[in-house]
Amino acid sequence: MNNPPPMMGYQPSGGGSVTQMLGTPQPLAQPLHQTGPTQQAQQMLQQPPGLVSSGTRQMLGQIGQVGSNPLCHPHQSDPTLVNNPIWKLQLQLAAISRQSVGQANVYARQNAMKKYLMTQTNGSQQPADMAKSLVDFTKQYLLEMAADPAVPNNAALAASGQQIQRPHGTPVSTPSTPKAELANNAQTTPSILLQQQQKKLSQFNIDEDDEVEHRMMAPVNTKYDEQLWHTIDLSNLSVYNLNENLFKYDFLTRLYLNGNNLTHLPASIKQLQNLRVLDVSHNRLTELPPELGMCYQLKYLYFFDNMVSTLPWEFGNLFNLQFLGCEGNPLDRQLIKILTEKSVTGLIFYLRDNAPEIPLPEPRRFIEVNADGESVETYRCIEESTNHLNEELLKKSFTLLSYNTLCQHYATPKMYRFVPSWALSWDYRREKLKDEVLAYQTDIICLQEVESKTYEEFWLPILEKQGYSGIFHAKTRARTMQSKDAKKVDGCCIFYKNSEFTAVFKDAIDFSSVWMKHKKFQRTEDYLNRAMNKDNVALIIKLRHERTGEHVWVVTTHLHWDPHFNDVKTFQVAVMLDYIEKLLKQHGGVGSPQDKKKIPLVICGDFNSQLDSAVVELFNTGSVRSHKDIEGRDFGYMSQKNFAHGLALKSSYGSIGELPFTNLSPTFTDVIDYIWYSTQALRVRGLLGEIDPAYAAKFIGLPNDKIPSDHIPLLARFEFTKGSSATINTNGNKTV
């Protein structure tokens, strides 16, 4: 059979039969809709054997069986679905999909025809319907439905709207989509949801076929994509099994497996995390693998005419999904109810918010490190490690925690659509953060992304009760705002145990203002256009260790986030280190350049810089002369001196290897948080280990119900080396 796709178009809702709603030409409507899928399959099977392959004949027989099963077509038992715009779209697209059964590599053929027709018309006309693929029709119909004023905006279609609380162990009979994630619409009807989807289907949402053309027209200085193809079409080829090598092509954005004899999809499909389109319609699947939920970039997922009865909870990760083709399956009626009332967005949110708890196998281990920097023992927690320390080391050491806590104003449902709404709420997260920070009981606590109000009303009262004192410094813009608005600006804070330390000196750095006051300040174009408007800060405190009389300088910072401004981050670190060196000279009794290397110093925070960055090179080597991050940039004196500093610093995790990640998100997972220390004054004696890898592999990003931030905390135990600051004069009592 080689019928072209039906000449369909979206028809405004409101009465009429399924045939009329589909707008199918009468010659095609007769065999398609009036005789039903079973008879259609029988008619095709009656054709001469040479026209239909054996695999196709088997598939058509299967479709016929599915078509005769009312469980696979809920509108047969519930006629109201015929007038539901969401289900009408299912029927439209399922009918289009069925027309391609038996056409080998149908997507490739349609794409070739589309390109041919565009070439013939010089791109002046839209391709004919016969050249449109199922994906093309899907996008077209979604846009038409979203723009159609005739689609009923009926509040009766919306669910009862009961509040979703922590759901584990409690079935939700009438689930609802969190209002915050549906733009607080009073009526969350299919038409409203489709209008929201229209924004995602705009011309700026480029699909991969368009990206190929876009790359061909890209400017010469655009980074070249070496991978020239991103699609595999194995449609209608009588495939029974898939080779595992297929899933090593992690660059794939489209995979077409429809019209085959597949009975399962392998778990390794999770490796295709660039996948945007997957069509597995007209197979013999009885389930979809939970691992498919890791393919969070999926926009269009089709599994028409299989035997799938439910959806994995892991599909709650598919926050980019715009269409889920499920007609022709004995899908659970509760899921169909949610789909038709809340659209695919509400269905995904339901799966996300009601997913069973994934237990954390064990807490992060604490790794004991010997004087040579080698790991020698692993403990279940830092408390257990402390209990095993000898008395001398316990007296000469202290512990420090660095943690980006994810400011509540950054943790929006729009930015973290993969996180259950209840787990993203600030009330829930702050309790988790409090429990986590207090559980570590470190001597020094350095936090980033803390709102002024949160510091004053949450962290300070809690930690003061635990015997801590603290200081805080908000980002620069807080100094230009009214008090009420300034309370919402985040910054950095440092807490220290009063039983372990006494504050000797405090200061803060606003990078831009500090540099403008520098005696060698120059108004370069890069500083004015790229760095001056960044309002990042650093917070500094000098502490006296009560048990040893030693002094340690503690600095915490949060650098600019944008990877396109890695030069600015390098500049910010250079300004910070330059300022710290001046403070060490003024308030540390530094006589020679070598003296400042012997002063205990810890610099920690979120540096938004990967291990191969200029920032890390600057910390490790003392300067950065030639690096892609700073290539062609001019920050005046800082660039002229290669951003150099005179401190001897090293990452605390350097001796045992950095963690697999400190920040986990769908689009970025890497190490960007560090604890740097002065190697001639301090020695690392313990480190907090990684999150259980098997547990982390089950999530596309953080936070979640167990980990309340998109970052994980770093924790280190430091030992003062003998006499590191015994000869250094310690004066000064400046405060902020």
Swiss-Prot record:
LRR repeats lie at residues 251-272, 274-295, 297-318, 320-342. Gene3D superfamilies: Endonuclease/exonuclease/phosphatase, Ribonuclease Inhibitor. Mg(2+) binds at E449. GO terms for cellular component: CCR4-NOT core complex; Cdc73/Paf1 complex; P-body. Its EC number is 3.1.13.4. It comes from the Eukaryota. One of its GO terms (biological process) is transcription elongation by RNA polymerase II. It catalyses: Exonucleolytic cleavage of poly(A) to 5'-AMP. Residues 160-177 have a biased composition (Polar residues). It is found in: Cytoplasm; Nucleus. InterPro entries: CCR4/nocturin_mRNA_transcr, Endo/exonu/phosph_ase_sf, Endo/exonuclease/phosphatase, Leu-rich_rpt, Leu-rich_rpt_typical-subtyp, LRR_dom_sf. Residues 34-51 have a biased composition (Low complexity). Residues 1-52, 160-182 are annotated as: Disordered. Its cofactor is Mg(2+). Keywords: Activator, Cytoplasm, Exonuclease, Hydrolase, Leucine-rich repeat, Magnesium, Metal-binding, Nuclease, Nucleus, Repeat, Repressor, RNA-binding, Transcription, Transcription regulation. One of its GO terms (molecular function) is 3'-5'-RNA exonuclease activity. It is an enzyme of class 3 (hydrolase). Acts as a catalytic component of the CCR4-NOT core complex, which in the nucleus seems to be a general transcription factor, and in the cytoplasm the major mRNA deadenylase involved in mRNA turnover. Ccr4 has 3'-5' RNase activity with a strong preference for polyadenylated substrates and also low exonuclease activity towards single-stranded DNA. Belongs to the CCR4/nocturin family. PANTHER family: CARBON CATABOLITE REPRESSOR PROTEIN 4, POLY(A)-SPECIFIC RIBONUCLEASE. This is CCR4-Not complex 3'-5'-exoribonuclease subunit Ccr4. It comes from Eremothecium gossypii (strain ATCC 10895 / CBS 109.51 / FGSC 9923 / NRRL Y-1056) (Yeast). The lineage of its organism: Eukaryota, Fungi, Dikarya, Ascomycota, Saccharomycotina.
